[in-house]
Design a protein with these regions (language model features):
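Single conserved hydrophobic/aromatic residue that forms the stacking wall/gate
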Residues: 1-12
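Conserved hydrophobic/aromatic pocket- or pore-lining residues that grip, position, or stack substrates
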Residues: 6, 19, 58
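Conserved acidic residues
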Residues: 9, 15, 168
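Short glycine-rich phosphate-binding loop at a beta-alpha junction
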Residues: 14-20
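Short coil/turn segments at secondary-structure boundaries
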Residues: 20-21, 172
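Thiamine diphosphate
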Residues: 26-209
Length: 209
């Protein structure tokens, strides 16, 4: 199957996909489709930043004959990017990893601008760093793309190389820096007291036997 239609559509029927936290991944989660169970690895609501990359590495170790694709934003990917050295070793199975590159912690930046009157701090990432370049220095393939068609083409080639030639590819997708709206507006509201509720109303916790 081709990924031309959405860039993150049906990669292969037997694909395993992992994602990370953040707005980029939340949007990307909408497009993959699956015909079997246990094909999608995601952090869910637990928020373990940096989950996507090591998760897809583990999936490939467990299922070496299955195509795997991980994706993460550049902030989350930076948490676990040290494992680029690991996957560069000859004995490691090949993977394909997509990194959405908007040079910022987008969700956190949007939240702080909402809370603090368009002010933000500590959310910008270094624009001189290229993850594709780091991948090449780690002995694997790194490519940069800047559009959906280019991503689709690069992803097709990367998965083919993964399955036929045992090649690991990191695809760095260059994005604009537009801040998206929070997925839950109610989460950004100021805390309020709930009328009529008192701590004494709650049942005391019991020790676990």
């Amino acid at each position: 199957d081709s990924v031309k239609s959405r860039g993150l559509g049906d990669v292969y029927k037997r694909q395993i996909i992992s994602s990370d936290i953040g707005n980029n991944c939340a949007i990307g989660n909408a497009y993959p489709t699956f015909e079997e169970g246990r094909k999608y690895l995601a952090p869910g609501l637990f928020g373990p930043c940096g989950y996507g990359f090591p998760a897809i590495c583990g999936a490939k170790i467990a299922q070496p004959d299955v195509p795997v694709v991980g994706f993460a934003g550049d902030g989350a990917f930076g948490i676990s990017m040290n494992e680029m050295v690991s996957v560069g070793r000859d004995e490691w199975p090949p993977i394909t990893m997509i990194i959405f590159r908007n040079y910022q912690w987008g969700a956190e930046k949007r939240n702080t601008t909402l809370w603090f009157d368009d002010n933000f701090v500590g959310t910008e990432l270094d624009t001189d760093v290229t993850y594709a370049g780091i991948a090449q220095q780690c002995g694997v393939k790194g490519v940069q793309v800047d559009g959906m068609d280019a991503l689709a083409e690069a992803l097709d080639k990367a998965i083919e190389a993964q399955m036929k030639d045992k090649v690991t590819t990191f695809i760095e997708v260059l994005l604009n820096q537009e801040l998206g709206e929070p997925f839950r507006r109610d989460a950004m509201k100021k805390p309020v007291s709930v009328a009529g509720i008192d701590p004494s109303d709650f049942r005391p916790q019991q020790p676990v036997s």
